[in-house]
């Protein structure tokens, strides 16, 4: 897991204000790991993962802003980007314990997480741990459970 720089652009702050605002639509989701009961989070899908279809599909009217911010982050860090399979915002309330590891996709990929606040909750990828601060950005290989 590697922490990269967040350019903190005007578009980033616009996206952050949108996602953390009162009017942003969140949808209740249960644990992605069906072996655990009681774990939940809220989600807003911008670009749906290509699980049941060979291509991802747009699910949010706000995708262009999210896409711009992701491109800015990659360009600022001089990182190549070939394709985006999924774009999603998650909000996870504090809960007892940790959720079991899960795999986001069954094919080779990389994950990018942008932390819009510092509400707590560590990210575990294999043996690595990130204790996020507001506006942190991390990237890691999708071959690991997270």
Where do the PLM segments sit?
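Non-heme Fe(II)/2-oxoglutarate
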Residues: 1-82, 92
């Amino acid at each position: 897991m590697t922490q990269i720089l967040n350019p903190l652009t005007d578009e980033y702050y616009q996206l952050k204000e949108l996602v953390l605002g009162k009017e942003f639509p969140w949808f209740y989701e249960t644990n992605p790991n069906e072996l655990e009961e009681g774990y939940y989070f809220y989600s807003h899908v911008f670009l749906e993962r290509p699980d049941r279809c060979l291509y991802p599909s747009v699910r949010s009217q706000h995708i262009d802003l999210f896409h711009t911010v992701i491109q800015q982050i990659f360009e600022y860090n001089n990182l190549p980007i070939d394709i985006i399979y999924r774009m999603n915002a998650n909000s996870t309330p504090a809960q007892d314990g940790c959720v079991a590891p899960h795999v986001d996709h069954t094919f080779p990929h990389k994950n990018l997480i942008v932390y819009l606040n510092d509400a707590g909750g560590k990210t575990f990828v294999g043996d690595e741990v990130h204790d996020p601060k507001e506006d942190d950005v991390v990237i890691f290989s999708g071959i690991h459970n997270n």
